[in-house]
Amino acid sequence: MLEEAGEVLENVLKASCLPLGFIVFLPAVLLLVAPPLPAADAAHEFTVYRMQQYDLQGQPYGTRNAVLNTEARTVDADVLSRRCVLMRLLDFSYEHYQKALRQSAGAVVIILPRAMAAVPQDVVRQFMEIEPEMLAMETVVPVYFAVEDEALLSIYEQTQAASASQGSASAAEVLLHTATANGFQMVTSGAQSQAVSDWLITSVEGRLTGLGGEDLPTIVIVAHYDAFGVAPWLSLGADSNGSGISVLLELARLFSRLYTYKRTHAAYNLLFFASGGGKFNYQGTKRWLEDSLDHTDSSLLQDNVAFVLCLDTVGRGSHLRLHVSKPPREGTLQHAFLRELETVAAHQFPDVSFSMVHKKINLADDVLAWEHERFAIRRLPAFTLSHLESHRAGPRSSIMDVRSRVDSKTLTRNTRIIAEALTRVIYNLTEKGTPPDMPVFTEQMQVQEEQIDSVMDWLTNQPRAAQLLDKDGTFLSTLEHFLSRYLKDVRQHHVKADKRDPEFVFYDQLKQVMNAYRVKPAIFDLLLALCIGAYLGMAYTAVQHFHVLYKTVQRLLLKAKAQ
């Protein structure tokens, strides 16, 4: 029998039996010569940043889920249920996002360009409008953001092509494509998100004590340092509120020099406060006021506060607006400051449009509009200076608020306006006859654009979401060190949410590693099993009826020789 099998195999290799040779050897040949799938194509690992998840005043916001293990599709696909929907920022719209949620998608991954500064302005404005709407609704669908790279872009394009072909092909083509196409399984490495217990929101206070008696008037300068956006790890907050903190630090530097010399040491206390939790209903300011007004007898806030100046989003545009809850009365120091701002802007910077915006405090709202409202509730005269017309403006809470959105010259100009107006109030220069077009800060005492630039670069070199800034982290220690160079009695204040009725709750798993594995669909395994079964059946039949096969081959060979 073995000799007969050898003879058959020898005959099979002859040209006349080439089709039969294909049948016998083709599967083995294909397995041997098929190139292996490159490792880079088989799997890709990349970092993803989860959408906000927090509770504020007992109200949940953002996504409530972090675990992802499902197949990728683009929004063009007809069926998105239990699929990971990939969207590029340039093609993103709120309607597409809603479509994914309505169809019970397993997850949404939004792919961001590497250079955010190069994103077209119409796309930036549209996404800034969408971000608050995304956060306003609670969703159980995990929502992630990823920064585009070549491999991730290739995954998106392949997935998009597969999704598009399913929508436009015939039923047979769809079935064939479904059985043979490559897919991508998206898997996150982290666990389900959990509430972070005992998280501290930190604020930093410093002061310059005025020259004279104990009962000197106090001017308070406030800016919150934290940033906010739809994804905490992408929240750089360049304009809101990196610009405000930059101005506060520059004012601290300038007035510390003035307060160094007795001749220019004013009879005003200057209290500087870099507040934390500004994007979460100004939690740092709220606790600071409670501690200063209700639980201590030695605070500068208790006696003779002239006014509180809050700085929020002052890094671009040709407008400056003073937002007030109650218009200042004539004869008060806050009214004098308002007039000095108008005077300096009109005479020294005529290209700047200055105005006052009056908005009453709405205590029915879950979140206060501006930081000065925290002080106004405690009957302290306060206002917020900003280039924004409304507290609902998109740049105040967007991941699109990157370094390129802050114009250095504009920020320097606005710093000069604020410094000049404050100085004219503190030293009563207008009453002393100083011309309105004469700048106070010149030569060695001028506002330094290089200093402001370096501070802005430092602030926007890291995300500053409140959930990410630990009290012992480098950011807060650097901020405290910077203030200590110019101010006295610099110290930290901490806020911790109440365990029984917390005003705010943060959650973890905000940054994870996601893996995209190239996979075949389940129907491909079924098709492959059918093909293998058919091949094995043919082989089994050939072995069982080997004598028939042998006689058939012999007959074919004899016929060929006879011809």
From Swiss-Prot:
Bilayer topology = Single-pass membrane protein
Q: Which organism is it from?
A: Mus musculus (Mouse)
Keywords (A to Z) from UniProt? Endoplasmic reticulum, Glycoprotein, Membrane, Signal, Transmembrane, Transmembrane helix
Q: Which domain of life is it from?
A: Eukaryota
Signal peptide start and end residues:
1-42
| Residues the record marks as carrying a glycan | N241, N428
Q: Name one GO biological process term.
A: regulation of signal transduction
Higher taxonomy:
Eukaryota, Metazoa, Chordata, Craniata, Vertebrata
Family assignment?
Belongs to the nicastrin family.
Which protein, by its recorded name, is this?
BOS complex subunit NCLN
Q: What are the TM regions of this chain, as residue ranges?
A: 523-543
Q: Which residues lie on this side of the membrane: Cytoplasmic?
A: 544-563
Q: Any idea what job this protein has?
A: Component of the multi-pass translocon (MPT) complex that mediates insertion of multi-pass membrane proteins into the lipid bilayer of membranes. The MPT complex takes over after the SEC61 complex: following membrane insertion of the first few transmembrane segments of proteins by the SEC61 complex, the MPT complex occludes the lateral gate of the SEC61 complex to promote insertion of subsequent transmembrane regions. May antagonize Nodal signaling and subsequent organization of axial structures during mesodermal patterning, via its interaction with NOMO.
Where does it localize? Endoplasmic reticulum membrane
Q: Which GO terms describe its molecular function?
A: ribosome binding
Q: Which GO terms describe its cellular component?
A: endoplasmic reticulum membrane; multi-pass translocon complex
Stretches assigned to the Lumenal side: 43-522
Q: How does it assemble?
A: Component of the back of Sec61 (BOS) complex, composed of NCLN/Nicalin, NOMO1 and TMEM147. The BOS complex is part of the multi-pass translocon (MPT) complex, composed of three subcomplexes, the GEL complex (composed of RAB5IF/OPTI and TMCO1), the BOS complex (composed of NCLN/Nicalin, NOMO1 and TMEM147) and the PAT complex (composed of WDR83OS/Asterix and CCDC47). The MPT complex associates with the SEC61 complex.
